[in-house]
């Protein structure tokens, strides 16, 4: 599923607004120990973002790359902009930036993905954030994760993923180190026990 499909969807699918939590046996290194927020799911496939993978780039790096600031300017950015989190959202279009954010900010290009969360993938939100404005809660993700028609359903059926309702606090939490464990804990599952059980399956 692509961003254009997300824009044109008419109804929400079964996995919309769900977390996917990778099982210990996940063989794809792109998704090992990941938590993914599913933004859209339909008969055409699914699209979402990894929310617990750091990115080496900073928001200042992004602004420099987009020529929004000059090399000598980063220090004048508002503190909120300098601290703005950048994460790896997935292996598809990994050079493209997407901003998941609270619904207090909206532009003509913003796409609602839940009652409280929107997705914007245009420069207007980057400019707003660089000025210390923009949404109260947000994170930028480079790339996204995508599944073809029926692919995600098959992976879940084959025990590749656990699923649970998404938690907005976890989506925007900047502490990435233990998000995987906390997502599992939210389901009442101990990550260490899950790994041990998978190893003896």
From Swiss-Prot:
Q: Which family does it belong to?
A: Belongs to the UPF0301 (AlgH) family.
List the PANTHER family hit by this protein, alphabetically: UNCHARACTERIZED PROTEIN YQGE, UPF0301 PROTEIN YQGE
Q: Which species is this record about?
A: Rhizobium etli (strain ATCC 51251 / DSM 11541 / JCM 21823 / NBRC 15573 / CFN 42)
Entry's HAMAP family? Answer: UPF0301
Full protein name: UPF0301 protein RHE_CH00966
InterPro entries hit by this protein: AlgH-like (IPR003774)
> Which NCBIfam families does the record cross-reference, listed alphabetically?
PRK00228.1-1, PRK00228.1-4
Instruction: Note the superkingdom of the native organism.
Output: Bacteria
Annotated GO CC locations: cytosol
